[in-house]
């Protein structure tokens, strides 16, 4: 039929459409590009839209175009920060989300348009690393938002906490897929952030947001530093201009292992494998400068002006990389004298209760410290100078007092102890089990001299006239006859300790081994005698004194130089019929009876075996 139809036969086939590089770009509409940003004006939206359009057209660019586009993006980021200033305490939160959204758009366009014959923009090459930077900030700050509130007794609104948890879940989930396209996750995260701002604004209008919560939000979400983001970009642009680098060179940062290893069980719990935030990767050793105790930001919550001025997250008072003058600095060489606290009332970031002072001028400054509730006063004793010398943090939410003590090295600390002097008890860090952390608690007897060393410890610990017990450990001392005095089984006890000549260095713990000894060599092994039992939450009802550490006990048994071993044995009359050397038999048989500790029984059997095989002859 087509042959009989001349009009149909005369038609030519349609010409083929020649597809070029820029015609293949799928341009996104303005709502997709602009509507996901938070609190931007129409003029700023037009500027962002023009930058995105220029990014599409210059994806295959020259060196000059790349440098010019980097400067344009830098100006756009500064304008975004300027527009978000009216958010006050939520300024940093909104700025992080907007900048994350901007570079996520750059990355999404770069993934869609992959050119192989031209050089890409530097912002396109670095977009993945910049997204990683802002995404880690969101995860770190939201984690810190949940962690620091119970540490400072701050009650967060339930509605706001739910929406913040949704945002944290979205950020953690998308952090696992950083190598893939980020367009879908970008919109979900921005919607979750908008929901957080909507709930916070409604609660603030209803008067349910206290001034402490406002200051807390300003502290947790600091304003990002744009100079820190663009400084490596500008540096690379200068190297490209000088011929030292090319646009095809990618920005490579130091590799960091932040996600749990992939194993055969990963497919069963893939959604639980989250990127670990920075706040949970900090060191917790008391002797390091990166130590987190129980962070106290009560001073910042009372004064919101200081949080607004602090725009750098690495310079905050609770940052792990900064040390207060009150915290002793690590010494490069041996110093025989302990470091005493400074005279100024500057506190470390882990302390809330200041040490008591005998000066009348400093008592007036302690009035702003919040008082403990009545429930805590019935359980805890009155804090003395000795316990306040340690950095103390009071948690009204759990009615506990956690101690973060800056310990010196064991050698330096043991060198200041005189075993022949009086005894003084000191409290050591208490457990904080309600926050997911557990630290051993020790209350022990430390002998000090009556003159120089005692004065030295008074300056450092505040007198040392009272023995204090915290947690599930008790402390006491021994009199001249070796009888334990001052032992307690209560959970929180405090009683004065009189100065007596101590013949035993004793401490207590959850597992009661045999009795202790008074050898001066045990003091050098001072800290090694403290076992660590993480996660123990049971409080025993009875305690028995602990034996010294295993190396110290073996030295006594093998060297025969300890006074304790010499008191337990005496020479027996020689066997005239055999003519052998004099044998040593125990004098106090009641001391050789089987104890409740298997380790002590085994040590005694080893000692008896060596004594029977190779008896020692003494004059």
UniProtKB/Swiss-Prot annotation:
Give the residue ranges for region: Disordered.
301-389, 563-603
Taxonomically, what lineage is the organism? Viruses, Duplodnaviria, Heunggongvirae, Peploviricota, Herviviricetes
* Disulfide bonding pattern of the chain: none
Gene Ontology molecular function terms on file: DNA binding
Q: Where is the composition biased (Polar residues)?
A: 589-598
Q: What is the protein name stated in its UniProt record?
A: Putative transcription activator BRLF1 homolog
Q: What does this protein do?
A: Transcription activation.
Give a yes or no for keyword S-adenosyl-L-methionine in this entry.
Answer: no
Keywords associated with the record:
Activator, DNA-binding, Early protein, Transcription, Transcription regulation
In which family does this protein belong, per the annotation?
Belongs to the herpesviridae TAF50 family.
Write down a Pfam family by its short name.
Herpes_TAF50
Which organism was this protein described from?
Answer: Alcelaphine herpesvirus 1 (strain C500) (AlHV-1)
Biological-process GO terms, alphabetical: regulation of DNA-templated transcription
């Amino acid at each position: 039929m087509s042959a009989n139809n001349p009009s149909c036969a005369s038609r030519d086939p349609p010409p083929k459409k020649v597809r070029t590089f820029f015609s293949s770009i799928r341009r996104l509409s303005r709502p997709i590009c602009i509507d996901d940003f938070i609190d931007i004006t129409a003029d700023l939206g037009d500027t962002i839209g023009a930058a995105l359009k220029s990014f599409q057209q210059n994806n295959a660019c020259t060196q000059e175009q790349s440098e010019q586009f980097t400067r344009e993006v830098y100006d756009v980021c500064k304008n975004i920060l300027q527009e978000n200033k009216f958010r006050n305490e939520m300024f940093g939160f909104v700025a992080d989300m907007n900048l994350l959204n901007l570079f996520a758009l750059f990355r999404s366009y770069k993934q869609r348009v992959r050119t192989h014959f031209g050089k890409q923009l530097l912002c396109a090459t670095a977009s993945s690393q910049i997204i990683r930077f802002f995404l880690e900030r969101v995860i770190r700050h939201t984690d810190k938002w949940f962690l620091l509130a119970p540490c400072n007794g701050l009650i967060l609104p339930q509605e706001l906490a739910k929406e913040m948890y949704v945002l944290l879940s979205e950020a953690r989930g998308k952090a696992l897929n950083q190598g893939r396209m980020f367009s879908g996750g970008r919109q979900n995260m921005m919607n979750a952030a908008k929901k957080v701002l909507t709930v916070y604004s409604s609660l603030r209008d209803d008067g349910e947001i206290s001034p402490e919560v406002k200051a807390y939000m300003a502290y947790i979400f600091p304003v990002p530093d744009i100079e820190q983001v663009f400084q490596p970009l500008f540096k690379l642009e200068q190297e490209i201009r000088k011929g030292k680098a090319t646009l095809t060179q990618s920005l490579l940062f130091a590799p960091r292992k932040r996600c749990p290893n992939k194993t055969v069980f990963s497919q069963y719990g893939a959604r639980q494998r989250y990127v670990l935030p920075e706040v949970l990767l900090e060191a917790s050793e008391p002797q390091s400068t990166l130590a987190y105790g129980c962070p106290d930001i009560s001073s910042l919550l009372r004064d919101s002006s200081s949080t607004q001025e602090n725009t750098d997250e690495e310079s905050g008072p609770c940052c792990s990389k900064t040390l207060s003058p009150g915290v002793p600095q690590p010494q490069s060489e041996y110093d025989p004298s302990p470091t005493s606290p400074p005279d100024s009332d500057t506190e470390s970031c882990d302390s809330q209760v200041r040490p008591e002072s005998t000066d009348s001028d400093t008592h007036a400054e302690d009035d702003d410290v919040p008082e403990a509730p009545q429930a805590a006063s019935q359980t805890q004793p009155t804090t003395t100078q000795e316990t306040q010398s340690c950095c103390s943090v009071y948690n009204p939410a759990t009615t506990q007092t956690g101690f973060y003590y800056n310990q010196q090295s064991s050698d330096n600390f043991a060198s200041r102890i005189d075993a022949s002097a009086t005894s003084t008890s000191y409290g050591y860090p208490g457990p904080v089990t309600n926050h997911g952390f557990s630290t051993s608690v020790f209350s022990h007897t430390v002998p000090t001299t009556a003159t120089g060393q005692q004065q030295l410890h008074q300056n450092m610990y505040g007198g040392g006239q009272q023995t204090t017990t915290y947690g599930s450990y008790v402390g006491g001392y021994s009199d001249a006859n070796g009888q334990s005095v001052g032992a307690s089984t209560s959970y929180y006890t405090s009683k004065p300790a009189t100065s007596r000549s101590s013949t035993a260095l004793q401490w207590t713990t959850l597992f009661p081994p045999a009795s202790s000894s008074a050898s001066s060599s045990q003091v050098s092994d001072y800290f090694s005698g403290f076992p660590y039992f993480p996660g123990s939450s049971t409080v025993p009802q009875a305690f028995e004194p602990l034996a010294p550490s295993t190396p110290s006990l073996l030295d006594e048994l093998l060297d025969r130089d300890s006074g304790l071993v010499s008191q337990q044995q005496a020479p027996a009359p020689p066997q005239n019929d055999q003519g052998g050397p004099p044998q040593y038999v125990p004098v106090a048989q009641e001391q050789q009876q089987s104890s409740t500790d298997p380790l002590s029984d085994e040590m005694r059997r080893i000692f008896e075996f060596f004594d029977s095989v190779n008896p020692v002859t003494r004059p």
